[in-house]
Amino acid sequence: INAYWYNAVCIVRELLKKQGEEEKAARLDALSQKIKKSFLKKFTKPDGTLYDVLPENGEPDDASKQVRCNEIFALTMPFTMIEEKQAKAILAQVRRELYTPVGLRSLSLYDPQFHPHYGGTQFERDMAYHQGTVWAYPLGAYYRACIRFSDEPKQTAKDILHQLAQLNAALAEGCLGQIAEIYDGECPAESRGCFAQAWSVAELLRAYEDAETAAAFGRNI
């Protein structure tokens, strides 16, 4: 949420500049710098990755330290508060603990509260929904961040296209040509939830566009 807020402030700042509203733009520029400084101070862990949430008192608790896929979105906005070194630390953690070929886990597989499978009673499904279940839609943001902060974006993009090709099997199960809402947190990752989820498909298409563009032109996005 903080990353989206920072991005929104920066976008409005740039729009004001285009309209010649320099004084208003300067105020938003000062605000954006304040947001960035505060965010990095409060949300950065000692290892350079990000706390997931902070309680009202601002002091990290057990929930803050859980590794979840939300931190990937801080890397993919047009305006980001995260510098390259920190971004690479975040990507390494996401790749190690959350990444699967069909999406990102909602909780690290090393967390004691990790649920590897989504199923059972309504209560059991609810307990797994955000506690390890793989969500497909964050995959687009993850791949964009991989390209953006790569030292070799062209090769990274080609690798991503190869990884995306592995999703052909997912497109052929359930509802043909669609990607499900969620998948089990452990392999084999069975599709669960909604069998044709619009945001899963949309992010898959975005990932293809990002990777094909970077592979063709060899630039970060």
Where are the predicted features?
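Catalytic cores of carbohydrate-active enzymes
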Residues: 4-92, 96-118, 162, 168-201
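Short acidic-aromatic active-site loops that bind/stabilize oxyanions
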Residues: 1-5, 131-132
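Terminal, non-catalytic domain-edge segments
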Residues: 201-221
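Short, flexible/disordered secondary-structure transition segments
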Residues: 153, 178, 215-219
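TPR repeat positional signature
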Residues: 2, 9, 139, 143-146, ...
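Alpha-solenoid helical repeat scaffolds
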Residues: 15-18, 22, 148, 152, ...
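Generic structural signal for hydrophobic core residues of well-folded globular domains
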Residues: 78-82, 94, 146-150, 208-211
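C-terminal substrate/ligand-recognition segments
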Residues: 113-152, 156, 205-209
